Amino acid sequence: RPNWEERSRLCGRDLIRAFIYLCGGTRWTRLPNFGNYPIMEEKMGFAKKCCAIGCSTEDFRMVC
């Protein structure tokens, strides 16, 4: 289990689990249109950043 006070490098399954743990639950909603590319690109950039340099709890809160 990563220490959420510091940056942790999370890739693949670990990133997905952390995202669900921190952002999941009743707050989740479906995107009404998958053509909303700016949001999708932002999420992909977040995933690449977490894998390359790591991310903190605060980083997750900005994309939840």
Swiss-Prot record:
InterPro entries referenced in this protein's UniProt entry, alphabetically: Insulin-like (IPR016179), Insulin-like_sf (IPR036438), Insulin_CS (IPR022353), Insulin_family (IPR022352)
Subcellular location: Secreted
GO molecular function: hormone activity
Intrachain S-S bonds: C11-C51, C23-C64, C50-C55
Family annotation (SMART domains): IlGF
Subunit structure: Heterodimer of a B chain and an A chain linked by two disulfide bonds.
Protein name in UniProt: Relaxin
Species this protein is from: Leucoraja erinaceus
Classification lineage: Eukaryota, Metazoa, Chordata, Craniata, Vertebrata
